[in-house]
Design a protein with these regions (language model features):
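Basic- and aromatic-enriched surface patches that contact anionic nucleotides/nucleic acids
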Residues: 47-128
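Short alpha-helix boundary/capping and kink motifs at helix termini
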Residues: 2-56, 60-66, 73, 78
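N-terminal non-globular leader segments, chiefly Sec-dependent signal peptides
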Residues: 1-13, 110, 122-128
Length: 128
């Protein structure tokens, strides 16, 4: 897998037709990286929540799965009056990690337990 950077994501977005629309203005590159790594190693994720063609919950999961050509489930949900569609080329991809080291450890532990994997393996595949 190529490195996940704002440039590689922008290039990916311009060269692919992404069926679902974003409703979030910013996404976190380190989270996308970790999710791509986990998906590539068979770790399962919850479905994303979609209303019509809008992502309501699961932007990082959706884009990560799309980048690595991984099938991710979708469940219907409702939107609110505040939900606004955003073109993917207007979404800002930030380098700052939104997850604390403690949260990363917690999520890795959950994923290891749920997928019956050793925690050290999950830590290894998600470290840069």
């Amino acid at each position: 897998m190529q490195d996940i950077t704002s440039e590689s994501i922008a290039e990916f977005i311009t060269s692919h037709d992404i069926p679902l629309m974003a409703t979030q203005t910013k996404l976190c590159i380190p989270i996308i990286f970790r999710m791509c790594q986990k998906m590539l190693h068979g770790i399962k994720f919850d479905e994303i929540k979609v209303c019509d063609n809008l992502i309501i919950d699961g932007h990082h999961r959706y884009l990560s799965a799309f980048i690595i050509n991984h099938k991710l489930g979708q469940v219907p949900t409702n939107s609110t009056s505040a939900t606004e569609p955003i073109s993917w080329d207007l979404v800002k991809f930030v380098e700052d990690d939104w997850d604390t080291p403690a949260k990363i450890d917690y999520l890795n532990e959950l994923d290891a337990k749920y997928n019956k994997l050793e925690i050290e393996f999950v830590k290894q595949i998600t470290s840069r």
